[in-house]
Amino acid sequence: MRFSIISASLVLIFANVKAFNEEEILEIFCGVPKKLVSRYNQCLIDHGPEIIKKNYEIINSCMKGHLGSETESAMEYVCNKKNVDISIKRCISDKISEEMKEFDRRARLEVWDVLYVCIFKA
């Protein structure tokens, strides 16, 4: 569950920046130590805005049936290239893109504030 929140926040960051392709995003994400991911996830759960929670629900719905209940199993699924299912990627991408259309500038700034706190001060 927590994995989904970090995924959603990373999608938000990289969707806004558009500086990285999918492969580079995956490489960055999969290089993060699991302990740090857990700490970051908890910070987002505690401080995250509504859009993070919506994206978390989207990712959960798209990956339903492919994951166990632990963060590690989710990371292993996503980071193992053998498990990449294009339909899951497409589901997440399409639904989050749709959600972002209604995401105003003020809400984007709120996400950046929370991400900054969770990355640098947690």
UniProtKB/Swiss-Prot annotation:
Tissue note: Expressed by the venom gland.
Protein name stated in the entry: Venom protein 7.1
Free-text description of this protein's post-translational modifications in UniProt: Contains 3 disulfide bonds.
Keywords: Disulfide bond, Secreted, Signal
Major subcellular site: secreted
One annotated Gene Ontology cellular component of this protein: extracellular region
Location relative to the cell: Secreted
Signal peptide boundaries: 1-19
